[in-house]
Every structure is written in structure tokens, then in C-alpha cells.
Amino acid sequence: MTDMPSVTTPALDRYAVFGNPIGHSKSPFIHGQFASLTQQTLSYEAILAPIDGFEASLRAFFQAGGKGANVTVPFKEQAFALCDSLSAEATLAGAVNTLSLLADGTIYGDNTDGLGLVADLVRHLGSLQHKRVLLVGAGGAARGCILPLLKAEVGQLVITNRTQSKAQALVDIFSQVQEGRYSDKLQAVSMSELSGVFDLVINSTSASLAGELPPLSQSIIGNKTACYDMMYGAKPTAFNQWALQQGAAQVIDGLGMLVGQAAKSFALWRGVEPDTSGVLKLLRDKLQVDAQ
């Protein structure tokens, strides 16, 4: 009797998201759906990294065969510092949400948050060309979105923040990009001095999570203004409720941005960008069920 030849099952390509906390993460579900849609075979898990142990957790993951990783709060800046090479978006954002282990063993970092935002905005609003846009907030979420918005050819990008100097610092940084190509489109304005109606208002702050609002004048909202909150939930966020009360034409939450940035990450790793509409509907339905 001859021995049957042994058959080895190839190891799954492993991916993960690192954060702390991480139990709430929808990334494993999203990437699992993307894998099914694109007929890719892979695994994707959520990893709780110790606050003081992100680098060790990440390197252990890569040493064990990990191919790529997403990074969420509070580790995006640490991930940036660990990269051997970076995309233009990541370099200017000063933060990374997507890591790839390259064939030579080095780590490449990208920031797909802004790309996900712009993809979702275009899906809802069409072209962003020539639009007058207000970006509320000057933290990491805002910083990661500025270059993609400028590349989408917005007409004007006004940045406002409770601390005016932080908004001005971002304008100073991005005014230098590509030999000042975007300098005439960028402006920092204090919240109390905002004037005129905007075509699009984007809230990058997390104020809605606490049911709070940035101190904005209702005069910035017109009957054709679209408002976008990067936060999301089963019900309209506090910011989007306020925008509707001021007569905004349309309000959009950040669930599509979450799915959009995941699709960009998936494309970086797998070479194919999945359609997001079906996954977005599944997540939206799940939010409603979980809220009941």
C-alpha cells in the first residue's frame, strides 16, 4: 500500500486592525465582506494592542506572517513613525491608517481616511469641483482629509477650529504643497468670524459622540448646503440634526467614509477595489437592529 501524497493547505494571507479599544471595530466584518465580493481568500482580525505596546504587537504580527494592517486610535501617529516609506497623503497627514509589509521586509504606510471621505462625498454629491467647503476641526481627522479634498479640486477650503492657531498651522503646512499650488484655495477663519454660505460643511470633530456641537453660526448653512459628519450612528448625529434645523439640503454621516477608507486599504493590499454599496447597506441595517 503506497502512502498518499501529503497535501498542504496554503496559509491564509493575514490582515488585522490594531487599536485600543478595538472591540467595537467593524473592520473585520467589512474586510470579510470585501473578500467574499472579490473572491479573495484571507483572514482579518481585530487586535487589542496595549497602549504602551503597539510597536511590539505590530512587529509580532508581521513576524508571524501578517501581510498588512489597519491602525485606528490611538496608534495612527505611532504607526507613521514606524514606516520605512510613506504615501504623500500619509506624509502630510502625519498619521497612518494602512500598513503593508513589502517583499523586502520594509513597512509602507498610507492614509486612506481622506480618500474614503472624498469617495463617499462624490457618491452622494457628485463632483466637488469649485465647491466652497468648510472643514470644522484641526485634529488628525481633519489633517488626513485636506490633501484629498484639494486634489478633488474644491474651489475653496476654509478650516475653522476652536483654537484658531491650529487651523492656521494646517493652512501653513498645506499651502507649501506642490510649490504652493493650493495656497490660494486655503484659508483659516475663526468660528466667530465665519461668513457667507458654504456648499459643503464637514465636521471632523468627535463632538457628536458626546451630543455636543461646535459653536457655529447658522448663517453658514444655506438651502443648498450639504453637511457631513465624520461620526455616525443609528440616528442622525447631533451635528447633522443641527444642520437640518438650520435648513441644510442634505446631511450625511461618516459610515460611508469608514467603508470607503476600508475599500482603499483593501485595494492597496489585494490589487482590486471592491464595490462598497452592498457592504454599506448591510452595516446601516445592522446599526438599526443593534439600536433597537
UniProtKB/Swiss-Prot annotation:
| Protein name (Swiss-Prot/TrEMBL) | Shikimate dehydrogenase (NADP(+))
User: Would I find NADP among this entry's keywords?
Assistant: yes
Q: Can you state the subunit structure given in the record?
A: Homodimer.
Q: Which GO terms describe its cellular component?
A: cytosol
The protein's organism comes out as: Shewanella sp. (strain ANA-3)
Quick check: keyword Transcription regulation in the entry?
A: no
Pfam families per record: SDH_C, Shikimate_DH, Shikimate_dh_N
Role noted for this protein: Involved in the biosynthesis of the chorismate, which leads to the biosynthesis of aromatic amino acids. Catalyzes the reversible NADPH linked reduction of 3-dehydroshikimate (DHSA) to yield shikimate (SA).
Record-annotated active site = 76
Q: List, alphabetically, the CDD domains matched.
A: NAD_bind_Shikimate_DH (cd01065)
Q: In its UniProt record, which GO terms are filed under biological process?
A: amino acid biosynthetic process; aromatic amino acid family biosynthetic process; chorismate biosynthetic process; shikimate metabolic process
Give, as in the UniProt entry, the pathway in which the protein acts: Metabolic intermediate biosynthesis; chorismate biosynthesis; chorismate from D-erythrose 4-phosphate and phosphoenolpyruvate: step 4/7
Q: What Gene Ontology molecular-function terms does this entry list?
A: NADP binding; shikimate 3-dehydrogenase (NADP+) activity
The UniProt record lists the EC number as: 1.1.1.25
